[in-house]
Amino acid sequence: MAHWRTPSRIFLVGPMGAGKSTVGRELANLLGLEFIDSDAAIEARTGVSIPWIFDIEGEAGFRAREAAVIDELTGRDGVVVATGGGAVTTPANRDLLGARGVVVYLYTPVSVQLQRTRHDTNRPLLQSDDPEARLQSLLAERDPLYREVADVVVETTGGRARSVARRIVEALQGQPS
């Protein structure tokens, strides 16, 4: 059996509350790669918060900034990148993610997303009267896009971040190189 080689670029996609940042850090640790959160990179580059960008520039302005960061981050080697939940809504992002690395979709049911995000005020798309309905709507819209771009799908329920990261490694080891 051939020795498995760690991919040099792993991109995590999935809805808010999937654990992309938490699991991404664990995965990077396990594989000896650098972890980068695309939302944190946007905030570092702009010097302002994601909610501020949404308030001032709207979602379209944020998506334009996100696309530039995704383009940059997907060109780096030795990284695990956690993308924002809506990154896949931009066709160019899907193309870059799929062409430049291995994409892992962290599938998470809405009930779990809601539990994980209910007290987080740093999520502009959840500032609604009915966050659960909003999450349902976003998942219905984005799940096909996550699946389209994903090389592997790993469910994030029923385990701590480290065990999810281990399941990702196992799933990646089963992928053709």
Swiss-Prot record:
InterPro entries hit by this protein: P-loop_NTPase, Shikimate/glucono_kinase, Shikimate_kinase/TSH1, Shikimate_kinase_CS
Catalytic activity entry: shikimate + ATP = 3-phosphoshikimate + ADP + H(+)
Organism domain of life: Bacteria
Binding site for Mg(2+): 21
Cofactor note: Binds 1 Mg(2+) ion per subunit.
Transmembrane segments: none
Function: Catalyzes the specific phosphorylation of the 3-hydroxyl group of shikimic acid using ATP as a cosubstrate.
Protein name: Shikimate kinase
Native organism: Halorhodospira halophila (strain DSM 244 / SL1)
Species lineage: Bacteria, Pseudomonadati, Pseudomonadota, Gammaproteobacteria, Chromatiales
Gene from which the chain derives: aroK
